[in-house]
Design a protein with these regions (language model features):
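NTP-dependent small-molecule kinase module
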Residues: 3, 142, 156-204
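Post-Walker A alpha-helix
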Residues: 23-24
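P-loop (Walker A) phosphate-binding loop of NTP-binding proteins
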Residues: 13-15
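Conserved lysine of the Walker
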Residues: 20
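Conserved phosphate-donor/acceptor-positioning beta-strand/loop module used by diverse small-molecule
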Residues: 100-105, 114-138, 170
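Extreme N-terminal, non-catalytic leader segments
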Residues: 1-9
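Post-Walker A helix-loop "phosphate-sensing" segment adjacent to the P-loop in P-loop NTPases
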Residues: 28-37
Length: 204
């Protein structure tokens, strides 16, 4: 019996230094597969890249038109080029039962939750302010000024944790990843995502 439940969009956030990249890598190591969305960009196509696979390559004028038409769930400008995630990309994958994960900054996460109210939001929280400081300083790339900026920004972002559905403290990477996997598995079996399967079973 080939039955598919409704997919979901996962918003994955946390302050700089909370270890969210490491946690995400660990989740993938455990065999969790996420659907990849194809972003739109105005940068030039590089050798070996395929339009529609690596990116959707468009002109600046086309990109700005998409902004005007409210087609993006989020977009940014970096080094003179625009990058954005289309709402239609997420909707298409979720409708086919996929699990789309967007690792995104706190500010962007707020916009995504407004656009997709069924999105599952997870915030990775450091175990203490001291641990956060040590992780930021441990990178060895921070000047005193840049550290202060990143640390104060992180504190402001941590204050936004109540806006998320789930908050997971990253005191141990393996345990944190297991907790996130548990959240994802539980969310997959919520009635709103199982309804199609249930209806199909009942109507056979």
């Amino acid at each position: 019996m080939d039955l598919k439940n409704k997919g979901m969009l996962v918003v994955f956030s946390g302050p700089s230094g909370c270890g969210k990249d490491t946690v995400l890598d660990k989740i993938k190591e455990k065999g969790y597969v996420f659907d990849k969305t194809v972003s739109v960009t105005t940068r030039a196509m590089r050798d070996g890249e395929i339009n529609g696979v690596d990116y959707y390559f468009v002109s600046k004028e086309e990109f700005l038109e998409k902004i005007k038409n409210n087609e993006f769930v989020e977009y940014t400008e970096y080094s003179g080029n625009y990058y954005g995630t289309l709402k239609s990309e997420i909707e298409n994958r979720v409708s086919k039962g996929g699990c789309v994960l967007l690792k995104i900054e706190v500010e962007g996460a707020e916009n995504i939750k407004k656009a997709f109210n069924e999105a599952v939001s997870i915030f990775i929280f450091p175990p203490s302010k001291e641990a956060l400081k040590n992780r930021l300083l441990g990178r060895g790339t921070e000047t005193e000024e840049s550290f202060n900026i990143r640390y104060n920004t992180a504190l402001k972002e941590m204050a936004k944790a109540p806006q998320y559905d789930y908050v997971v403290i990253n005191d141990n990477v393996d345990l944190c990843a297991e907790t996130v996997c548990g959240i994802l598995n539980a969310e997959k079996t919520k009635y709103l995502r199982m309804q199609t399967i249930i209806d199909e079973i009942l109507n056979k």
